[in-house]
Amino acid sequence: MCIRDSLHTAPAAASVPAKPVPAGPDYLLVDGYNVIFAWDDLRKLADGNLDAARRRLMDILCNYAGYRRCVPILVFDAYKVRGGAREVEQYHNLYVVYTREAETADMYIERATHELAKEHRTRVVSSDGAEQIIVMGHGALRVSARAFEEEVRAVEKEIREFLGE
């Protein structure tokens, strides 16, 4: 071995133990209005009827979650509603959260992610840059609304192919 080879040998990489993959269900937290106003078809629907856009997103997430086998939590801001209490309803396999007065969807998602990501693989769908950084700090994976739309369309295509449509 020549001296030059020994001087230019890369140092061994430090071994950092990988975080174990959590057992149990995967969680998917979705910032509802962020997605509605990022997806063209939902935004157009919301221009005429916001409730219809919310229901359409709920149906989309039910199908997606059933196929991907994850626990979806869809969060809508209600922070401008005076005296509003947090409301959680179940719509098929989907949990829908309407935040309480003075609570944004981001605030709810940050708290939920902080708890869920300790024990479960957790993904957050939001195009809010600050939100993405915070949830990544809690150990969650982040997905932009646009990237999630592409993922949903791919799942819908797989479902149609499976059903032979």
Regions picked out by a protein language model, each given a short descriptive name:
Residues 4-7, 16-30, 34-165:
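Nuclease catalytic cores that cleave nucleic-acid phosphodiester bonds
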Residues 12-14:
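Catalytic core of IPPT-family isopentenyl/dimethylallyl transferases
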